[in-house]
């Protein structure tokens, strides 16, 4: 017994099926950052600001960036872009709540909307490193990424959900004790309500 899928608006159009028994469709796809930015200005860039995030000279782990979501909506972390002068590895923390970065770090500037005509703001508490060897003393490390010198996206952060009251942070450990400038930027968004 067969059935027919029609468009439901009374035009009489129905779905076509190819000889290989595949439904033929025409679709428009967008990514979540683009959609949130266009629909309400709710896609943002937030990070360590500027070219130099922190100068790391001791070869030890240094917490670089912390953010806590204070909005009623879930914050989605889409991607992280990192830049470092020497190789090393990053740790991504879930729910850090204490450490010298959180207690003594510099309050980061406001997250910048990707929609230049929007007045939307991200409701975040943020901190950036102001010294080498800043720390997170709690939180759970959920992933690591080893990176060569240069600029790279960290795609392992795709679709990380940060509910209200939750936080995230990132640290970097350079391979050696040579001074290394580091910058970290996150692309985040609040999903549009359906």
Give, region by region, the residue ranges found by the protein language model.
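Beta-sandwich interaction modules
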Residues: 140-166
């Amino acid at each position: 017994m067969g059935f027919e899928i029609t468009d439901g608006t009374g035009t009489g159009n129905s779905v076509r099926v190819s000889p290989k028994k595949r439904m033929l469709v025409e679709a428009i796809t967008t990514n979540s950052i683009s959609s949130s930015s266009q629909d309400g200005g709710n896609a943002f860039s937030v990070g360590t600001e500027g070219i130099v995030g922190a100068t790391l000279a001791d070869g030890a782990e240094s917490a670089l960036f912390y953010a806590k979501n204070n909005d009623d909506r879930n914050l989605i972390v889409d991607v992280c872009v990192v830049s470092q002068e020497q190789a090393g590895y990053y740790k991504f923390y879930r729910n850090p709540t204490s450490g010298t970065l959180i207690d003594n770090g510099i309050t980061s500037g406001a997250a910048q909307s990707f929609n230049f005509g929007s007045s939307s703001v991200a409701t975040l508490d943020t901190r950036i490193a102001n010294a080498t060897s800043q720390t997170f003393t709690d939180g759970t490390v959920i992933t690591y990424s080893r990176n060569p010198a240069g600029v790279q996206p960290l795609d392992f952060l795709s679709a990380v959900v940060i509910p209200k009251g939750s936080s995230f942070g990132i640290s970097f450990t350079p391979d050696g004790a040579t001074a290394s400038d580091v910058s970290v930027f996150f692309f985040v968004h609040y999903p549009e309500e359906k």
